């Protein structure tokens, strides 16, 4: 890893953010950290249910909606048209294909979605195919590609970042295995100027992720601009201090 980021470079990043660290702590205590919802557009939902859920989540304050795609291009376009009409142009749409396509299919589908001004496209193809992602990126222009939830260590992230194949880094705090490995990836992503949007689609991951996005914002990256973290409304009732809607909050109690 020293070829990509030396200990001295990592220390410099952490040191440079010390001066206004308290200001960022105060900001997240007051405002929280913005999130996006994955609940409005699962595959198999009827048009009526999608409209209902989009309106419900907009009423709760969400502006970012992640939609599942990948089974049928025409059906995907129809659903995206419906969602864009429902949420308007002031809200954001991102799509997740869950590795449904090969490289050529990915290029075809993503180019067909461009008119919807997508916030990002997540996992269009195999999460191990770094060169495939690089080819997709070359062919789809300024559409941002998000991946990383299936990466089990910093070396995979190194390859994605070095190749320019990853525009949004989606760490998964369980697959990476330790906070030390996570911080290594956060520092590396910052060096490559790639924002980190942690994956949180699992039991307890939202509760873990709220700590990680605060670490990234307060100590490493120093900015929340154009960033959101995944929120999935799943089994939060089993936690003493569950995460809140729309903006994840800085824990104020032990175990929070």
Where are the language model's segments positioned?
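Short, charged low-complexity intrinsically disordered segments located at boundaries
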Residues: 1, 12-16, 111-113, 142, ...
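N-terminal capping/lid subdomain adjacent to the active-site entrance of alpha/beta enzymes
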Residues: 3-93, 98-107, 111-116, 241-248, ...
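Structural signal for conserved beta-strand scaffold positions within catalytic alpha/beta enzyme cores
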Residues: 38, 170, 230-231
């Amino acid at each position: 890893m020293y070829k990509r980021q030396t200990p001295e470079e990592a220390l410099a990043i952490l040191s440079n953010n010390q001066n206004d660290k308290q200001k960022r702590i105060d900001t997240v205590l007051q405002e929280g950290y913005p999130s996006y919802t994955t609940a409005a557009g699962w595959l198999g939902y009827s048009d009526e249910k999608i409209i209902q859920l989009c309106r419900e989540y907009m009423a709760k304050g969400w502006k970012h909606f992640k939609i599942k795609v990948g089974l049928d291009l025409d059906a995907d376009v129809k659903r995206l048209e419906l969602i864009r009409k429902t949420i308007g142009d002031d809200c954001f749409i991102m799509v997740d294909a869950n590795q449904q396509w090969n490289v050529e299919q990915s290029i075809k589908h993503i180019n067909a979605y461009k008119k919807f001004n997508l916030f990002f496209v997540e996992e269009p193809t195999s999460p191990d195919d770094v060169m495939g992602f690089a080819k997709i990126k070359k062919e789809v222009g300024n559409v941002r590609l998000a991946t990383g939830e299936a990466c089990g260590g910093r070396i995979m992230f190194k390859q994605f970042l070095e190749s320019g194949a990853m525009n949004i880094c989606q760490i998964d705090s369980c697959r990476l295995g330790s906070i030390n490995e996570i911080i290594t990836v956060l520092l590396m992503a910052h060096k490559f100027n790639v924002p980190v949007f942690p994956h949180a689609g699992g039991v307890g991951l939202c509760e873990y992720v709220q700590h990680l996005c605060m670490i990234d914002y307060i100590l490493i990256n120093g900015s929340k601009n154009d960033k959101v973290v995944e929120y999935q409304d799943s089994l939060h009732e089993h936690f003493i201090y569950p995460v809140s809607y729309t903006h994840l909050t800085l824990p104020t109690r032990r175990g929070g």
